Structure formats: structure tokens, C-alpha cells
Amino acid sequence: MNLQEYEKVQNFTYLEYCDYLQKKYGIGLSDYMTKSWNKNNKVTRTKEGLLAHHKFEDHAILLSTREFAMQNPFEWQLAKNIVYCDYLEHLLLHILICEYPSNDKNVLEFVGIGGVVNFIVPELNDYYSGWETNQNWRKTCHDLIKNDKDVYFILIKRFKAFLNKCSLDTNVLYSSFNEKYGLWSKQQNESLFNEIAAL
């Protein structure tokens, strides 16, 4: 997602943005899970740089994992409820979930935020600090957003505003996804962290 497109969609609600992305990329190529709750590899579009997002993540967390998926309706795994997106579109989806959680969300589940602080932001911090993956599918996904660091910062600024509004600690943004694997470190993200702090 480039800046021009972000400016077009920035005021969408979560469900409006899901509809927009499904019009842009189409619905799931298949159901995300099989009837036995295993991931269906036919749903993947990473060769195009796209990730698969569950539309019902505004209701429940971690729907791409068997353990959490099984605790929720199978309908949420259907192709019609899969939204394709690039990494920055995925980040915006999760920010919008934080801003527009479903009134029917699972009790005691804080939807949206975990995707931002545990997965998407830590990886993009590393990527925009110079980390290069050796996984072909991930490289294809990164290549799709390589020229859109400005959009990343706009999204981070927006998410910081959400955290501040909810009196949550913005330090959760200063992370590295690959540090736990010994492939990168927070220190290597320091310059980016300074830019985030200034937003």
C-alpha cells in the first residue's frame, strides 16, 4: 500500500476496509482450514506478496492457529471470510480492529493488538532496519512494500495514538521479531526506533 492508497482508505471502518480489500484481491482461494482444522495450503498467495487475514479477527484472536480456530465457528474459516493483503494493509487491518472491535467479540480477548505488537510491527521494524530474510515467500511479501516506509510510519503514528488513548505503553513498539532466533537484534533497529519515538 502506497501513500496515495492509504489516503483513500484511511477513514474506512474495519469492515469497510475488509470489503475494499476483497474487491481489490478477491476472496480466499479456498477455506483457510480444512474440516479437520488443519491449514489448507491452497489459500496461500505469498507468491504474489499477499498474506491471508481472517475477517473475523475483530471477534477472536489467532484464528490462523488450530487451537484458537477450533474454539470458534468453522464459518469464520470459509473462503468468503478470508481477506488478502500486503504487510502494510495487514497492519492497517489490525489497527482498525483495535479501533473498531466487534460488539460480539470473545470475552477477555483483546482483538487486533496482539497481531500488531507480537507479529507485524516486530517484523517490519527489522525489515525497515535492513534485515533480509532467506525465505523466498517472505522476501516476495517484503518486496511489495519496500518503497512504502513512509506509510509504515504513518500507521505507527496512528497506532501510537490508539495506545495513548487507551493509556497503554508505547514501548511495545520497540521490538525485533528475529532477535529471539539470533538473526537480528533490537540494537540494529535503534535508528528506526528513534524515528518512531519522534512520531
Annotate each language-model stretch with its function:
Residues 130-199:
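Pan-zinc metallopeptidase signature
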Residues 59, 96-100, 123, 166:
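Generic structural signal for hydrophobic core residues of well-folded globular domains
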Residues 40-84:
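Histidine-centered nuclease catalytic patch
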Residues 82-112:
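Short Cys/His-centered divalent metal-binding micro-motifs
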Residues 1-43, 74-76:
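Short, charged surface segments at domain edges that flank catalytic/cofactor-binding sites
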Residues 66-73, 99, 108-110, 116:
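"Short basic amphipathic alpha-helical interaction patches in structured regions
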Residues 11, 83, 87-90, 142, ...:
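Generic detection of long, well-ordered alpha-helical segments
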Residues 103-133:
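C-terminal/domain-terminus segments
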